[in-house]
Amino acid sequence: MSDSSFRSMRMTRLVRPPGIPGIRKWAESNGHRVGRSGMIPPRVRQAYFAANPEVVEVVRVFAQDSGVGPDVYDWPDDGPLGPVYAIAFVRGLDEQEVLHRLGAEGQDIRLISDAEVAGHQGADGPEEIITIARLGNWVVAECKGRRGSRLEHVKALSIGGGEAVAVQRDRGAHDRFIYAVDGQVVTSFTPSRPFDRRGSDPDRLNGHLRLLGIDPTGDDIVDNAVPAALALASRISGVVIIDFGGNELPPHFADRFSGAKILNRESPRLGAVLGQ
């Protein structure tokens, strides 16, 4: 049941299989009187979804405050990490230990350039490439592949009193958000379905979810799911990943994220290339 007190700024759209008409066209064909614009009566919407159960309504969410929102992470598929990637935010470990717990041996660790990352096959090849950077108490590991979000790795990254937040983008069906503390998964969920949370304390991040426009007690399917999950990771860690040129943050970002730690991808960074 949705939290009746929850209100947010958001947009919805319908995801329809080929051949399924839109709601207005269906309504006209089935004797329901609706206008060409304006709101669809609730009874017509209910009838439409009952007749077309394969149609899904998804919600595009927005930050409800001036903090980090999904818009910051609306990256293109052809970005430096490609369509399949994992990003882990880790507190309590140094850079070498993060790479070690992700499976790297001493001889694997070296400096890696942005050009090498961009040219790497990632999840479609036999190896994955990882780069890391430290910002204050947190280390950010960017993996062109899936290693950084595997459950055993996320738990290992948090052992010893630390925290690890991992976000996996993997063509929708295998997207994942995991938050672990001291070796235990506190909460995890598929980013598009944040209502289905698992872990030792699945509701711990509900306050953050509400500020991202997500009702944690509702059943909305999130359209911009991975950007929202990355924004959630940023709110937990205080680290924001932004692609920009030069050494100074653009004024509109500097004003918006005052006090946040900004990761601008620098070349080269410490990293490793590991087998899948």
Which ranges hold each PLM region?
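Long, compositionally biased intrinsically disordered terminal regions
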Residues: 182-276
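Extended, low-hydrophobicity segments enriched in charged/polar residues
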Residues: 7-13
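Short, Lys/Arg-enriched alpha-helical microdomains
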Residues: 36-55
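N-terminal "first-domain core" detector
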Residues: 65-111
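Short, intrinsically disordered low-complexity segments
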Residues: 111-156, 160-191
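Defense-system signaling and execution modules centered on TIR/cGAS-STING-like, death/scaffold domains
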Residues: 1-2, 52-65
